Every structure is written in C-alpha cells, then in structure tokens.
C-alpha cells in the first residue's frame, strides 16, 4: 500500500460509498489512479454509488432561474428516487450548485455539465459524491439555457410544487413595451404549465404524427357522438383533417368553393355569400385543427380568456401596443415525464438493498 495516502482512500470512499478496505485494495490494484479505482469497484460490484446509479430516479425537482434583465434563463430537471430526498437540504444545495455551474460555463446539455468543473473538480465527481452522501440515485436529466437577442426577452414560471417549469421567449420591436412583454411571457408560461402543450406551433409536427393523431381523434369523436345520440344531444362534426399544416391553399380554396356551391343550391343570392362564407370557413378551420388546439401552444385557447387562442392573444397585444410580437422560444419540463418507474414489491426491494 506504499504511496496510497489516507486522503486518497477517503476520497474514493466518499465517491463510491464502498468499504474502507475495499477502497485501499482498489487503489493498490490500479497504482493509485482514482478513476480506475472507481471503475475497479464498480466492476467488482463494491461501489454502492454505482448500485444506486442503476436505480430509477423519477422524482426530484424542476428548477429555473431568470436573469433580472430577462435576457437569459436556465431550467433544469434533476431526478431522485423519492420525493422525500428532493426536499432535504443537501439535495437543494445540489440544485443550487447545478444552476450556478450551468450559468458559469454556459452549459446547454447534461453531457456538458458532467464534463464541466465545480470547485476545481469535475462536476461528475461532485455528483457521484452526492449520490453516496444522500443515498439515492441522482440524475441531471434535462437542461434548457436560453439567451435573448436584442429586442427579445425570456421569462418563465415554475409551479410551486417544483414539478413543472416553463420558459418562454418573445421577440418585440418597441422597447417601451418591454415590461408588458415580460409580463405577457410569464402569463403564457403559466398557461403552458397548466395546459401541457407539446410544441410551440403546428409546424413542429411531422405529417405522419398528424395523420396518426387524426385517426385517433376521429375515433374519439365518433364514440362521443354515439353517446350524444343516445342522450339526444347535438353531435360533433367529424373532421377530415387534424392540423393547420394539412390545410393548404388548395384545400381551403376547394372548401370555399364547396360552401359557395352549397349556398347556390340553397338559392341564396350571390351578393350575400361574402357575409356567410367567412363564418363557415372559420368553423371549418376550427373543426379541422383540433390537434393544434390540444397540443400546440399557439393553437390552445388561453386559460385567462378562453375565447382566444394564444396566437390571437399575441396578435391582439401587438395591435394594442403598436408592436410586432412573436413567441420564439417555448420549453416545458415536467418532472419524470417519459420515465417508466418500476413497481417492486417489498420483498424484492429488501433483496435489492441487501445486494
């Protein structure tokens, strides 16, 4: 064990939570190379931190920080195994240091974070030490780091339960409107936190996704109509399309012509068609963009005014403030979204802990 200091053994123990003698043996085997010693312990199944890192982390927090000038914002999802751990002071300090590191090194991905430096050592090393100390697997799963260009602002909203966070970026032209744009961005972020839009705009959808969702939507409406018919209630229109991306100029022109032919067959004077057709087209578009209304931020109806979509709210503010506003960024994190958490019985859990 010549040349292996007590300080190095302690450092390896802190990083892996392995036994003291196992740490000494590992360091001797690899001639004092700390990283190789960590790998050695993992390969031998002696690193408790490594075992913890194999367990599923689906709890934790979503945290964000917006710069005082609203020119930058950061958001992070950090997962733990239980919500209890997410509330302890050690975990809160980890979240704080993570945000500080993201800001200091202009980090945009978890991979960049792990390779960055914190207090003159790799962040990954710091994270492993916290896994050992806190006693649960901890994973920095998602990072968003937005920076505003000139005539842009970013703002955000984090729900009080620390499970949902949203960042919104808005472009504007008139600097005097900046305070109002900041408030608008926060209100829209609050809307998105509650309503869960998947994307900013229908242009972010693939055509295959829209076609698949439209088939499911039609089946859903047909089922609802069966119940409505049984109860003697009005039936919903069955859409042909699901999203604005399917409504090409040709599709709209064809539908407009169909409405005009319908009015002609009904004997309506041609001079009044211009008063009837726009309303019919508006209803046609509404009936055939239901996916947008459900899943896009711009297409959803605003929670603070459910007669207007977010796109209409932004357009109205542009007109009222003599500006040209545009939402340019939308990021939403929800804790554990997409993680499949294992259901284990008590006996299995105890057996795992004994390994």
Curated annotation (Swiss-Prot):
Which cell locations does it reside in? Cytoplasm
GO MF annotation, one: translation elongation factor activity
PANTHER family recorded for this chain? Answer: ELONGATION FACTOR TS, ELONGATION FACTOR TS, MITOCHONDRIAL
InterPro entries, per this entry?
EF-Ts_dimer_sf, Transl_elong_EFTs/EF1B, Transl_elong_EFTs/EF1B_dimer, Transl_elong_Ts_CS, UBA-like_sf
* Gene Ontology cellular component list: cytoplasm
Annotated SUPFAM superfamilies: Elongation factor Ts (EF-Ts), dimerisation domain, UBA-like
What's the main place this protein lives?
cytoplasm
What's this chain's function? Answer: Associates with the EF-Tu.GDP complex and induces the exchange of GDP to GTP. It remains bound to the aminoacyl-tRNA.EF-Tu.GTP complex up to the GTP hydrolysis stage on the ribosome.
Q: Region Involved in Mg(2+) ion dislocation from EF-Tu: what ranges?
A: 82-85
| Name of the protein | Elongation factor Ts
Q: Which controlled-vocabulary keywords does the entry list?
A: Cytoplasm, Elongation factor, Protein biosynthesis
Q: Does the keyword Protein biosynthesis apply?
A: yes
**A Pfam family hit:** EF_TS
What family is reported?
Answer: Belongs to the EF-Ts family.
Gene3D superfamilies in the cross-refs: 1.10.286.20, DNA helicase RuvA subunit, C-terminal domain, Elongation factor Ts, dimerisation domain
